Amino acid sequence: MKQFILSCVLSVAAIAPSQAQQTTRQLPVYLDQTKPVEQRIDDAISRMTLAEKIRIIHAQSKFSSAGVPRLGFPDFWTDDGPHGVRPDVLWDEWEQAGQTNDSCVAFPALTCLAASWNPQMSRIYGEALGEEALYRGKDMILGPGVNIYRTPLNGRNFEYMGEDPFLASIMVVPYIQGLQSKGVSACVKHYCLNNDEEYRHQVNVIVSDRALHEIYLPAFKAAVEKGKTWGIMGAYNLYKNEHNCHNQWTLNKILKGDWKYDGVVVSDWGGAHDLEQSVKNGLDMEFGTWTDGLTMGATNAYDNYYLSMPYIKAIQEGKFTQKELDDKVRRVLRLFYRTTMNPNRPHGFLCSESHYAAARQIAEEGIVLLQNRNNVLPINTQKAKRVLVVGENAIKMMTVGGGSSSLKVQREISPLDGLKTRLGKDGIEVDYARGYVGDVTGNYNGVTTGQNLEDKRSEAKLIAEAVEKAKTADYVIMFGGLNKSDFQDCEGHDRKHYELPYHQDKLIEALAKANRNFVYVNISGNAVAMPWKAKVAGIVQGWFIGSESGEALASILTGDANPSGKLPFTWVNSLKETGAHAHNTYPGTWRQKGGASTKGNIIDEEYKEGIYVGYRWTDKERIKPTFAFGHGLSYTQFAISNLRSDKMQMKQDGTITFTVNVKNTGKCAGAETVQLYIHDVKASVDRPQKELKGFQKVYLQPGESKDISITISKEALSFYDEASSSWKAEAGKFEALVGNAADNLKLKKAFELF
């Protein structure tokens, strides 16, 4: 329809004149593809009425904003979809619209993508998602998310890219580029400091400028400056007592000022709270379900959004000029020319085999082998006769639920079905025992899994059955962890505990005692407590990996694919091993009595740990976590050796290149990720013991070796100087630390910056 409208406008403009020159002369500048985009925007703005300007900067339905029919600008459609295109919902309700062609491929959640440590996977991800979005008529995907993993309790960590700003920065850029190469806008979220789900509308974050710039902003900055994202979504929370959907510091000063961002700022849904701030503090497009109650009961609630009729009225009353409005309109029109008005937009594809293949490849590269005692994995398909699968997460669909990322998929292969299919090829019997009962529901906004997971047996009977079957199995594979229920890996709330729910610890210990070939596969987007780690032979982090979940997990467990994922966050033993909980500042302190139930109440959360997030904190406190940041095993072995640099001294405007040799010393093909961290030997400010500043994944056949080089500039040596409000690289001695995990950096090379 959008292409049809544009074609009609172009055709009408070209009908009357017979001469090509006359046609060109009569074609409006805003439709003339030979003219610079900014000139076309100027012309369009000059033709638009006040009402037409207003209509394109606020929602007209749950996920769309209006175009300008008179000028041929079509409506603009957004959709949730960090890891799949969300099913269509009703115009003014969250229930699904009942479409028959809005199923999709569910790609792995972004924690899994980050765990691949492979920017190429990000590019593949973005391109495939863009094609799915195009087929569905979507112009903007509301993602990716790059909020930092500050606490493992955050219910939305599964949507993000881990704890390290450098890793997130590298991984987010190709995702954006891949998505936007298809003419679909990214909308990087949630800018910024949205690191909790609990009280997300009310939390005011108090953070040092240094931590803000070194930890919480770099991935957004990379998305803007390197990824060239066309959209940024503001966050629900407050910073300096202003909501981040209209914040003078984060939006006007940093994003649009310091970073020269030329795209649109979209409110999170219902994230606008004030007319004057919405007008003056950087918000460009307002979306949502409500606006502090103003829209309830109206004939057309969307007309009561702050950037709708209230804005028009304020302009007419002289409270605002059209200066701010024209900047918003300019940005939205620029977005239109990049998407809906882009004549070179390709065609979309839905649920294609190439998309399923991409989902599976990303999943296989992101699955992390955490522990493999006595080489219990891969399953020996030549000797095994019977494999027991245990756990609700072996059968439960994980694509439905979890909040706005919930999907309606064409197919989702369960871990149990994936293993049955794969092991059946070798004549291996696969048995199943439930083991525990967790969340038996399967409905989100009208999308249902169709599963009946009811099981009324007692905990004791469920465990007894699993243990009895485990005693005679060659292997026992348990799929446990979290799910997409409230207070687990789900939007809107945080987890209440670090421990596994549903008494899974008890089941795990019993199974480990019953069978020495016991493997625990953790399905989650978060770390969990593992008090039984020493008793378990194998541990795999399986994430939420979407449509091809069963296929990918079966490939890893049987050795058809060699695991190469690395953790994108530090897996702590307990909450007290994270700065947020060690300082006891999470979730914050309420300003008034009554907590969340008191209208207008704000909860202040101070990030007292500052820059010491994740491995930076465990290094500082000399804590040995359950599993380190960057940790991940393989079925083969690698030797990283011969670290050297192309110089011993580096100029402020220069670079230095570090090279190592990586050799596959094992018996099967595999991939290793070389990680480079920088240690500042002596600084004028307190600095982390080390910081990730480079990595590269390399694929090697048995016996094969390659040299891997990583080049850094002074940016990798810099810290944010609060006194001058700028980045600073101090002359002096540094060390490059190289290895394959934050706790396994055996190579060291000294150099100097002068």
Predicted regions and their residues:
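Acidic/proline-rich low-complexity IDRs
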Residues: 2-5, 9, 506, 642, ...
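Short beta-strand elements
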Residues: 744-754
